[in-house]
């Protein structure tokens, strides 16, 4: 009797293996392109290059300071946000999340409008007869921008750790008379210290790979990071060998940081509590004053740059800028790239999670983790490094394309996969635990299960992942910086051209449009499932 031939790869494994192979192949192709173009021969001259080591040291130094200045204040701000309830608190917490996806050049424009030599604070000091000496360029400007982006995110993540503390622990501490330092040390710190290392590692990695911020606010050779040196080597000096060498160094550093971040990241289980929302009745005056001051300072950090973008964008150049076809061409380019990259990102992420879910269900935990880790691998290759690999690969083979839509879409989709994984990973596991036995008993599998179960139950997480991926793509500048030209420009690239040509009023209008587009796109996509969507 003939036996049925077994497939070489099970059908449920094909999606994840295909997506993982694609991601790894792209990373490997970019790496080989960099390696082949790196200078051959004696590497001793590389290690003796004083400017190279200055760039590497500055990259680490600014990332360390940025992480320190973001995490330490975030500890106290998170405690203040946990203890206080005030009008607009939910809006502030949402703003803390939105800073993560805010286009870098929009924030930079707002920071320059507030802290620049012709900015709001300079005008205020001049009216008071004082001299404004702060310059938003150089190391201090880079740190200011990084704190603007990362302090809110760190506060939000640490607030989650505080919310996981069981109410019984807080009540017992109050009954024992624990206040101030002792309460922080014995109750809050054990929960915070598990979250602080992974948060600090994440911020360090993001700041180490920062490109648009340093490009806009670096202010000269003394404030140059590895990514900016790569851009200069390709765009100004056209030295592919040096760019490849710098990209390899950047990739090795980022790979080490990714592995460190993964090692430090530990899931914190929520505390079991019957006293949800319990608050200490002994709410002292000085505690309320300190918390209020911290929250007001956080608002003064976040709101002025955003308000500056809105206020400066509504100027007399507004009708003229809106009438320019170039603006709408850039907007359409940004929109189509963002939507295509977002959809591709979510599809690849679901492919990885689908096969990973099946591997875990078959008790193959290590294989499932390896499949998910392939999606995180792209963090070791920042956008500018990946784009450099594509640039060298195409330049040495078929030549650079006239329109780089496909390259930018593909690169942005890959760069957003880690964020989409974080959004979809836990909901996917929850659905597996809830419906797996039922699907097996009913014989629902494959495409039928995806259509009947996953796509219905994951409507909200899928919309959120798509929104994050689209907005991250629409605000990206690192990849477009290498491939952008007068025939292919996105809104961030167009804004950078306006800033570089000192058309500040035109740039203000573009920054406002980009800001509104990001918030509108994020809100519309996130609301697509509807308020009363049923996930059962």
Residue ranges and their predicted role:
Residues 171, 179-182, 268-282, 317-318, ...:
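Juxtamembrane inter-helical linkers in multi-pass membrane proteins
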Residues 270-281, 361-362, 528-536:
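Short cytosolic juxtamembrane segments of multi-pass membrane proteins
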Residues 4, 263-294:
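Flexible interhelical linker loops that connect adjacent transmembrane helices
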Residues 45, 90-93, 126, 167-175, ...:
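Short amphipathic alpha-helical coupling elements at transmembrane boundaries
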Residues 7-41, 50-163, 191-216, 245-262, ...:
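Membrane-water interface segments at the C-terminal ends of transmembrane alpha-helices
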Residues 113, 212-238, 476-504:
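Glycine-rich helix-loop "coupling/hinge" segments at transmembrane-helix boundaries
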Residues 163-192, 359, 437-458:
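Short helix-to-coil transition segments within interhelical loops
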Residues 52, 169, 178, 211, ...:
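Membrane-helix interface/capping residues of multi-pass secondary transporters
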